[in-house]
């Protein structure tokens, strides 16, 4: 009978297989792992930068208000100091932008979208200091701007900086870290990690490349930036409006009407922003002196309003809980809404370094509160609470303007910790977005990016013509 004998090649084959596995592991592309590690670095740096920016703005605002205390006995002097303090801070921000990094002006979010499409440069070595300190000047001066624009652009530029410092190669790494930094910036600005993720996936959906690595990187970056924020600011809702009552099912149709109102107003607001940009550009004509002086005048006006009518100035985070609590009359709400529409248009359209998320959240809250007060009077049988309409309206203008309803809904839920209102918020946001799309017009950031690219193309064409003319001569 034939017996099986152990093969002498078996141990050799096993060793050969082990060597091949080790060789394959060593030769495997480490880029995905490196990207994920760098995403954690980007998120950490963005979170620290956002905290520093937030603390810097708060410190400047406190110093500015403290300077007014010393002139409280002399009203004319008080108004003069209020104007000058804000004007000087604003002029500082405008000057930095115009002189050293024009792409740091405005929100900065369209710049990141353009960079993701390979249509706008990312010069982090000059944008980072200009956006940071310029934003400190404009927001610290009390202008009607949000901090999310600076933190998103700072975040995207930090992503590119990390890419360059660690010399990662490839389009995937560049694109992923840029998007990761932007998402981390929004998350740290509002203590809203899920909104930061949705912002990239929804608002930047035409530019964002959906790959397994990019999604993981965005998650990691957002987690790290939020951890950094909460280490210094604790785990609390950014806006404390208390726990509001849920909306009964038989009242949900009212939230659809509210969404329709925002769906009409959103595209109109976008047109006003673009029209104000054209108007203010005609005022300064590209001249740096005129532009800085114009910015100083707008900043000084916001400083005066911050003293005379505080609800009409600043980003709006202090206004939201007061309006939601029903502490304003209908007439006062109308005044605040009209005044803040004007100041928002002036500040944002002038090219000041600052965002428009926070001002739009405040406008949505005021309009939602006014609608809620009317509904309470017209339908007493429903036992309505005006504050629920304020929360629903907070993200509706954002949804109608930038066409990102999910981002607006989740952002407000994370900021206010009122998750029981998710259904009326979905109805309001969906109604606003659908009607805004039906009425036409581009989302705000897309329209601003299109203008920037058209201007860039015109400048490149002018330079090429000038170069051709010089060669011919």
Swiss-Prot record:
<feature type="topological domain" description="Periplasmic">
    <location>
        <begin position="310"/>
        <end position="329"/>
    </location>
</feature>
<feature type="topological domain" description="Periplasmic">
    <location>
        <begin position="70"/>
        <end position="76"/>
    </location>
</feature>
<feature type="binding site">
    <location>
        <position position="357"/>
    </location>
    <ligand>
        <name>chloride</name>
    </ligand>
</feature>
<keyword id="KW-1003">Cell membrane</keyword>
<feature type="transmembrane region" description="Helical">
    <location>
        <begin position="253"/>
        <end position="281"/>
    </location>
</feature>
<feature type="intramembrane region" description="Note=Loop between two helices">
    <location>
        <begin position="417"/>
        <end position="421"/>
    </location>
</feature>
<dbReference type="GO" id="GO:0015297">
    <property type="term" value="F:antiporter activity"/>
</dbReference>
<feature type="transmembrane region" description="Helical">
    <location>
        <begin position="330"/>
        <end position="349"/>
    </location>
</feature>
<feature type="site" description="Mediates proton transfer from the protein to the inner aqueous phase">
    <location>
        <position position="203"/>
    </location>
</feature>
<feature type="intramembrane region" description="Helical">
    <location>
        <begin position="193"/>
        <end position="201"/>
    </location>
</feature>
<feature type="topological domain" description="Periplasmic">
    <location>
        <begin position="233"/>
        <end position="252"/>
    </location>
</feature>
<feature type="transmembrane region" description="Helical">
    <location>
        <begin position="288"/>
        <end position="309"/>
    </location>
</feature>
<feature type="intramembrane region" description="Helical">
    <location>
        <begin position="405"/>
        <end position="416"/>
    </location>
</feature>
<keyword id="KW-0868">Chloride</keyword>
<feature type="topological domain" description="Cytoplasmic">
    <location>
        <begin position="1"/>
        <end position="32"/>
    </location>
</feature>
<keyword id="KW-0813">Transport</keyword>
<feature type="binding site">
    <location>
        <position position="445"/>
    </location>
    <ligand>
        <name>chloride</name>
    </ligand>
</feature>
<dbReference type="InterPro" id="IPR014743">
    <property type="entry name" value="Cl-channel_core"/>
</dbReference>
<comment type="function">
    <text>Proton-coupled chloride transporter. Functions as antiport system and exchanges two chloride ions for 1 proton. Probably acts as an electrical shunt for an outwardly-directed proton pump that is linked to amino acid decarboxylation, as part of the extreme acid resistance (XAR) response.</text>
</comment>
<feature type="intramembrane region" description="Helical">
    <location>
        <begin position="177"/>
        <end position="189"/>
    </location>
</feature>
<feature type="short sequence motif" description="Selectivity filter part_1">
    <location>
        <begin position="106"/>
        <end position="110"/>
    </location>
</feature>
<feature type="site" description="Mediates proton transfer from the outer aqueous phase to the interior of the protein; involved in linking H(+) and Cl(-) transport">
    <location>
        <position position="148"/>
    </location>
</feature>
<feature type="binding site">
    <location>
        <position position="356"/>
    </location>
    <ligand>
        <name>chloride</name>
    </ligand>
</feature>
<feature type="transmembrane region" description="Helical">
    <location>
        <begin position="77"/>
        <end position="100"/>
    </location>
</feature>
<keyword id="KW-1133">Transmembrane helix</keyword>
<feature type="transmembrane region" description="Helical">
    <location>
        <begin position="148"/>
        <end position="166"/>
    </location>
</feature>
<feature type="topological domain" description="Periplasmic">
    <location>
        <begin position="377"/>
        <end position="386"/>
    </location>
</feature>
<dbReference type="InterPro" id="IPR001807">
    <property type="entry name" value="ClC"/>
</dbReference>
<feature type="topological domain" description="Cytoplasmic">
    <location>
        <begin position="282"/>
        <end position="287"/>
    </location>
</feature>
<feature type="intramembrane region" description="Helical">
    <location>
        <begin position="387"/>
        <end position="401"/>
    </location>
</feature>
<keyword id="KW-0472">Membrane</keyword>
<feature type="short sequence motif" description="Selectivity filter part_3">
    <location>
        <begin position="355"/>
        <end position="359"/>
    </location>
</feature>
<feature type="short sequence motif" description="Selectivity filter part_2">
    <location>
        <begin position="146"/>
        <end position="150"/>
    </location>
</feature>
<protein>
    <recommendedName>
        <fullName>H(+)/Cl(-) exchange transporter ClcA</fullName>
    </recommendedName>
</protein>
<dbReference type="GO" id="GO:0005247">
    <property type="term" value="F:voltage-gated chloride channel activity"/>
</dbReference>
<feature type="transmembrane region" description="Helical">
    <location>
        <begin position="355"/>
        <end position="376"/>
    </location>
</feature>
<feature type="intramembrane region" description="Helical">
    <location>
        <begin position="109"/>
        <end position="116"/>
    </location>
</feature>
<dbReference type="GO" id="GO:0005886">
    <property type="term" value="C:plasma membrane"/>
</dbReference>
<comment type="subunit">
    <text>Homodimer.</text>
</comment>
<keyword id="KW-0997">Cell inner membrane</keyword>
<feature type="topological domain" description="Cytoplasmic">
    <location>
        <begin position="167"/>
        <end position="176"/>
    </location>
</feature>
<keyword id="KW-0406">Ion transport</keyword>
């Amino acid at each position: 009978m034939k017996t099986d004998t152990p093969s002498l090649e078996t141990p050799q084959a096993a060793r050969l297989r082990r060597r091949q596995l080790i060789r394959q592991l060593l030769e495997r592309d480490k880029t995905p792992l490196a990207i994920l590690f760098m995403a954690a670095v980007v998120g950490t740096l963005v979170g620290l930068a956002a905290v520093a920016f937030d603390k810097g703005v708060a410190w400047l605002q406190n110093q500015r208000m403290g300077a007014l205390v010393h002139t409280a006995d002399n009203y004319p002097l008080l108004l003069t100091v209020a104007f000058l303090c804000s004007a000087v801070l604003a002029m500082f921000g405008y000057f930095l932008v115009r002189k050293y990094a024009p792409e740091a002006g405005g929100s900065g979010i369209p710049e990141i979208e353009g960079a993701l499409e390979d249509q706008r440069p990312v010069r982090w070595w000059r944008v980072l200091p200009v956006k940071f300190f310029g934003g400190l000047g404009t927001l610290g001066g009390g202008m009607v701007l949000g901090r999310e624009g600076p933190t998103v652009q700072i975040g995207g530029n930090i992503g590119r900086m990390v890419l360059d410092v660690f010399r990662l190669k490839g389009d995937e790494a560049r694109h992923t870290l840029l998007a990761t930094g932007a998402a981390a910036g929004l998350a740290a600005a509002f203590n809203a990690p899920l909104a930061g993720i949705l912002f990239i996936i929804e608002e930047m959906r035409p530019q964002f490349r959906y790959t397994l690595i990019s999604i993981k990187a965005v998650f990691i970056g957002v987690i790290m930036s939020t951890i950094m924020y909460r280490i210094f600011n604790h785990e609390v809702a950014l806006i404390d409006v208390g726990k509001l009552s849920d909306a009964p099912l038989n009242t949900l149709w009212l939230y659809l009407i509210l969404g329709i109102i925002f769906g009409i107003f959103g595209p109109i607001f976008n047109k006003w922003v673009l029209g104000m940009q054209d108007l203010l550009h005609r005022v300064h004509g590209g001249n740096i002196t005129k532009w800085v002086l114009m910015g100083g005048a707008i900043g000084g006006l916001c400083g005066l309003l911050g003293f005379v009518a505080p609800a009409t100035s600043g980003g709006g985070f202090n206004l939201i809980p007061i309006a939601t609590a029903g502490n304003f009359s209908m007439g006062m709400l109308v005044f605040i809404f009209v005044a803040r529409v004007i100041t928002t248009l002036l500040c944002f359209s002038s090219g000041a370094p600052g965002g428009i998320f926070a001002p739009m959240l405040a406008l949505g809250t005021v309009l939602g509160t006014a609608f809620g007060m009317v509904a309470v009077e017209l339908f007493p049988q429903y036992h309505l609470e005006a504050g629920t309409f304020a929360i629903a309206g907070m993200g509706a203008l954002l949804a109608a303007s930038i066409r990102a309803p999910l981002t607006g809904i989740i952002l407000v839920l994370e900021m206010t910790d009122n998750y029981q209102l998710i259904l009326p918020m979905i109805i309001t946001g969906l109604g606003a977005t659908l009607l805004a799309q039906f009425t036409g017009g581009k989302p705000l950031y897309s329209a601003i990016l299109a203008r920037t690219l058209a201007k860039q193309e015109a400048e490149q064409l002018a330079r090429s013509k000038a170069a051709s003319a010089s060669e011919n001569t």
